[in-house]
Amino acid sequence: MFTEQVLNVIILLQTATVTATAIPASGCNAGDVQCCKSVQKADSAGGAALLGLVGIVLSNLDVFIGGDCSPITAIGVGGTSCSSQAVCCENNSFNGLIALGCVPINLSL
């Protein structure tokens, strides 16, 4: 029973981590396009854990942060893909560990 509850919570967290509306990749004027394995609100438990990894304290917790991100460089070229969540992030200065101020994007638009 406990295992089933834990599994349900994990599934809920995975499906609820990104709720922002995706924008086309061409509309990414805030920063670089990234492919992140996780994208969460900064005020969530997962977001707090990511921020704690690098000792960041944010004054605005109403932003999305990406975890384990890598740049996507050739938008519009065949073969561009992201098997996780494609995002446009304002601050990617943490060597891919986390990215701040992320907005989900749609690579197919």
Swiss-Prot record:
Name any one GO molecular function.
structural constituent of cell wall
Q: Glycosylation positions?
A: N91, N106
Q: Which cysteines are joined by disulfide bonds?
A: C28-C88, C35-C82, C36-C69, C89-C102
Q: Does the keyword Secreted apply?
A: yes
Listed GO cellular component terms? Answer: extracellular region; fungal-type cell wall
Q: Where in the cell is it found?
A: Secreted; Secreted, Cell wall
Q: Which UniProt keywords apply?
A: Cell wall, Disulfide bond, Glycoprotein, Secreted, Signal
User: Where is the secretion signal located?
Assistant: 1-20
Q: Name one Pfam family in it.
A: Hydrophobin
* Subunit (UniProt): Self-assembles to form functional amyloid fibrils called rodlets. Self-assembly into fibrillar rodlets occurs spontaneously at hydrophobic:hydrophilic interfaces and the rodlets further associate laterally to form amphipathic monolayers.
Question: Which purpose does this protein serve, as stated in its record?
Answer: Aerial growth, conidiation, and dispersal of filamentous fungi in the environment rely upon a capability of their secreting small amphipathic proteins called hydrophobins (HPBs) with low sequence identity. Class I can self-assemble into an outermost layer of rodlet bundles on aerial cell surfaces, conferring cellular hydrophobicity that supports fungal growth, development and dispersal; whereas Class II form highly ordered films at water-air interfaces through intermolecular interactions but contribute nothing to the rodlet structure.
Q: Which family does it belong to?
A: Belongs to the fungal hydrophobin family.
Its recorded name reads: Class I hydrophobin 18
What taxonomic ancestry is recorded?
Eukaryota, Fungi, Dikarya, Basidiomycota, Agaricomycotina
